[in-house]
Amino acid sequence: MKTLKIIFFVFVAVFLFYLIGYPLLLDVSSLKTQNPKLTAMMKYRMKQWEKEGKKVQIKQIWIPLNSISPYLIKAVLIAEDDKFYKHEGFDFDGIKKALEKNLKEGKLKYGGSTISQQLAKNLYLSPSKNPIRKIQEAILTIRLENTLSKKRILELYLNVAEWGEGIFGVEAAARHYYGKSAKYLTPWEAARLAAVLPNPLKYNPLGHQPYVEKRSRLIYFIMKKRGIIKEEYQEVEKETEDITEPEPTPNQPEKPEDTPSRPTLTPEPEQSPSKETPQKDFNTEEKKVENP
């Protein structure tokens, strides 16, 4: 009996260390000045590609926040975490909505994650939504918020977020999809890129999937309504139809997984991407990792 108790307490101790010790031992403070190399999400994808026999290169180009189009920054905040500068890591309204949807559907599908939570997951954890991983994510989110500035959290997120198979970070995404640096993304291009973040392997910013059309339309509409879009785009806007907010279509998801709910909009004709050539005259760090 005594042996069983010892085994039980050892098991509990190991479990608690895995649950709490791992996220507490990670060196989060190094992120103040150092850019992470391979993230947990990148490693996870590399294992997937190896298992599937795919030869995929990780394309990532580090870029400072001040070299990213303000339209892209605003579009991502609108799409993923509109309360980013107001909360301390958690959007409890978003979590409440996610829980209600999970209970309604009977499975852990929605997470209500903020940008800080997504960064914690991308850097250190697996994509799993099991309770243990969510607790670890919460601990890491608190540590990130207490250690890093909001500006640095946003900069890290935009540089490690997944934007397609092997494409990580906004600079690599801007060059891959639009042939330009992230600094020169237009409002419409920014809206399209932000729209696919919830599931970048399923959705393509250059495609015509109804979900992407509606979500990017919404993001663009909000940017216009808030006065984010500058005057030079007014002539282009005059050529488009008036923006309206229709009722959501029956079979179309109103929001992406892991983000607070948003309404949907009707599609808008896509603007042609600028022909400006990609700029490489600022401090960037390009990384290509080929899956063995």
Put a short name on every predicted segment.
Residues K2-P292:
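Juxtamembrane regions of bacterial inner-membrane/periplasmic proteins
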